[in-house]
Curated annotation (Swiss-Prot):
InterPro entries: DALR_anticod-bd, Gly-tRNA-synth_bsu, Gly-tRNA-synth_heterodimer. Its EC number is 6.1.1.14. The keyword Ligase applies. It catalyses: tRNA(Gly) + glycine + ATP = glycyl-tRNA(Gly) + AMP + diphosphate. GO terms for cellular component: cytosol. This is Glycine--tRNA ligase beta subunit. SUPFAM superfamilies: HD-domain/PDEase-like. It is found in: Cytoplasm. It comes from the Bacteria. Keywords: Aminoacyl-tRNA synthetase, ATP-binding, Cytoplasm, Ligase, Nucleotide-binding, Protein biosynthesis. It comes from Actinobacillus pleuropneumoniae serotype 3 (strain JL03). Tetramer of two alpha and two beta subunits.
Length: 689
């Protein structure tokens, strides 16, 4: 089988930097899928992406589809011909569909009779004839939320397309994609190298772009270069570069030929909280801040230029000039904010609505204050500090700094609280109330901060559900899914003895008559328990394990987690499958019983040795495991219950549960009821597959 390397490049105007990597990887995945569906073998598909191009390269791509043998069975011979031996309409219709006459059909003899059959070999198409359609479909299926048209064209794409290049080995593929004729022209860097040049082979692409066009098309190569140079520059300044993955990807998406440089700002700006300065550098300017070995911000930053002059002085000074006004603004806002205490901003919260039916931010802080105190009392935190932090929790939203730099909410509250002389735990809680901000984020460290974070999240969940505005589909304007999962993480990972029903009920009471949903407690609890499923699935825990625990609806998250871990462990035991099946059988038997099923076992009615053995073991385990269940030691309990396997198997082999004698029948049902209740103290293991 002969192969060639295949290249496809789509040359565009500047692509959205935050979406570039996602578009490029999706393009490569789509091409892979299309090649597989076409039956074309290949070694691998590589992707390339720069601000003005998306490209893929399929290595070792077969030059043609393999031939396929087909066999289409038609009607039975007895039904294919009439009494005169002429083809029936059924036979003729089948033959027509196969592109043959009935006379050309072969015969297939089977043990069920003789059938008409059409056998043929379909030659595979040359790969080059398929490539335009493969790339067109791959582009059409990219995750682009908003398309655009350009010029007088009707075609749509994320940005205007100016060049399309498709090479299969050394052959330029003819055709048109997105309204652009395929050509051997590739565009270089906008300012460096050749603006346009031609290539004659798929394997020339990367080298020609670098040498002629001054473009490093390999996204990962540019990224690695930026990272290495940034770390090198930071080390030279005696510091460490703060390089977040998302920002690094975005910067990589903004440049075609990266030139990593450093610049500085006046040391006087270091009097402003570092978070505000970093917010400006990262968010607005896409700079990498530099910290010293003690974690203090240095008056230097790293930036990446898309041009590479011999003397970079003008570029460096230009970036310093651009960032200076933003840092000056931050300095002014900070100094102005310090003139008023956080507590004195409380009245202004009355002018800002949290939600029309739920009142103002001042109303919300009053509720957070009360609920944080309740939570603190339950988890052993300082109640007064939790209430104080709850009271001040939203005051920094009224400051100039947070109004201008919104992502500094919380952290500026902490700095202003420290300036006001508030207790350190109170100050830190003002920042940590928003944790975790995203999946995998760290949790509040102190119990005071946990109290405020939970109070804030439960207030939002209860309030929004309480007015009937639960999330629908992907819409979640109040970020209730994040609030629910964040709350669960705090309670589980901090092992806090909190009950969801209790917290929602207390939260709902603080709204007075504002809530209109009478089922708000159940709705919020069910919503939060539903978040567990996604969490545990991400950890690789089987869905049936989660469902087994959900069937019992435990409302204490830490307890829920302990049950899931126990059932997940139980599922690995040799006896698990048999006991799950036995529990399913028990459930089915008991479900058919009319009226209440007793749990009283009458030893005098135990006849068979097997039922005596099971009854005694169940009664013994009930006594033995009572403290184990009470302490939430579910794995220990299930390990002991696993010892029931042989006894249960013997019982079902030898004992007729639904005996004719009513007393025997009820007594045996009572044994099974007690058996099932033992397992139900952990989960419904009959759900396990």
């Amino acid at each position: 089988m002969t192969t060639q390397n295949f290249l496809a490049e789509i040359g565009t105007e500047e692509l959205p930097p935050k979406a570039l990597k996602k578009l490029a990887t999706a393009f490569a995945e789509n091409v892979e899928n299309e090649l597989n569906q076409a039956g074309l073998s290949f070694e691998k598909v590589e992707w390339f992406a720069a601000p003005r191009r998306l490209a893929v390269k399929a290595l070792g791509l077969a030059t043609a589809q393999p031939s396929k043998k087909i066999e289409k069975r038609g009607p039975a011979v007895s039904a294919a011909f009439d009494a005169d031996g002429k083809p029936t309409k059924a036979a003729e219709g089948w033959a027509r569909g196969c592109g043959i006459s009935v006379e050309q059909a072969e015969r297939l003899a089977t043990d069920k009779g003789e059938w008409l059959v059409h056998r043929a070999v379909i030659e595979g198409q040359p790969t080059k004839n398929l490539l335009v359609d493969i790339i067109s479909r791959s582009l059409a299926n990219l995750p682009i939320p908003k398309m655009m048209r350009w010029g007088d064209k009707t075609e749509q794409f994320v940005r205007p397309v100016h060049t399309v290049t498709l090479f299969f080995g050394g052959e330029l593929i003819e055709g048109e994609i997105l309204g652009v004729k395929i050509a051997n022209v590739v565009r270089g860097h906008r300012f460096l190298g050749e603006r346009e040049f031609t290539i004659s082979h798929a394997d020339e692409y990367l080298t020609a772009l670098r040498e002629k066009g001054s473009v490093i098309a390999d996204f990962n190569e540019r990224k690695a270069l930026i990272l290495a140079k940034s770390q090198e520059k930071a080390t030279a300044l005696g510091g460490v570069a703060d390089i977040e993955e998302d920002l690094l990807d975005e910067v990589t998406s903004l440049v075609e030929f990266p030139n990593v440089l450093t610049a500085k700002f006046e040391e006087r700006f270091l009097a402003v909280p570092a978070e505000a300065l970093v917010y400006t550098m990262k968010g607005d300017q896409k700079y990498f801040p530099i910290y010293d070995k003690d974690g203090k911000l240095l008056p230097h930053f790293i930036f990446v230029s898309n041009i590479n002059p011999e003397d970079p002085t003008a570029i460096i000074e230009g970036n310093e000039k651009v960032v200076r006004p933003r840092l000056t603004d931050a300095e002014f806002f900070f100094k102005t904010d310090l003139k008023q205490r956080l507590e004195d901003r409380l009245p202004r919260l009355e002018t800002v609505l949290f939600q029309q039916q739920l009142g103002t931010l001042r109303d919300k802080t009053a509720r957070i204050e009360a609920l944080a105190g309740e939570i603190a009392a339950q988890i052993g935190a300082d109640k007064a500090k939790a209430e104080r932090a709850g009271l001040l929790s939203k005051c920094d939203l009224m400051t100039n700094m947070v109004f201008e730099f919104t992502d500094t909410q919380g952290v500026m509250g902490m700095h202003y609280a420290r300036h006001d002389g508030e207790d350190e735990e109170v100050a830190v809680a003002l920042n940590e109330q928003y944790m975790p901000r995203f999946a995998g984020d760290e949790l509040p460290k102190s119990l005071v901060a946990c109290s405020v974070a939970l109070a804030d999240k439960f207030d939002t969940l209860t309030g929004i559900f309480g007015i009937g505005q639960a999330p629908k589909g992907s819409a979640d304007p109040f970020a209730l899914r994040r609030a629910a999962l964040g709350s669960l993480r705090i309670i589980v990972e901090k092992n806090l003895p909190l009950d969801l029903e209790d917290l929602v009920r207390k939260s709902a009471a603080l709204f007075g008559d504002k809530l209109t949903n009478a089922n708000v407690v159940d709705d919020v609890v069910d919503f939060m328990l539903g978040r567990f499923r996604a969490w545990y699935q991400d950890e690789g825990i089987a869905v049936d394990v989660i469902q087994a625990v959900l069937a019992r609806r435990p409302t204490k998250p830490a307890d829920f987690d302990a049950r899931v871990r126990a059932v997940s462990h139980f599922r690995t035991l040799d006896s698990a499958e048999a006991l799950a099946a036995a529990n399913k059988r028990v459930s089915n038997i008991l479900a058919k019983v009319e009226g209440e099923i007793s749990t009283e076992i009458d030893r005098s009615l135990l006849v068979e040795a097997e039922e005596k053995a099971l009854a005694e073991q169940v009664i013994s385990l009930q006594t033995e495991l009572a403290p184990t269940f009470a302490n939430g030691e579910y794995q220990t309990a299930l390990d002991r219950l696993a010892s029931l396997r042989e006894t249960v198997d013997s019982f079902f082999e030898k004992v007729m549960v639904n005996a004719e004698d009513a007393n025997l029948r009820r007594n045996r049902q009572a044994i099974l009821n007690n058996l099932r209740n033992l397992f139900l103290q952990v989960a419904d293991i009959s759900v396990l597959q």
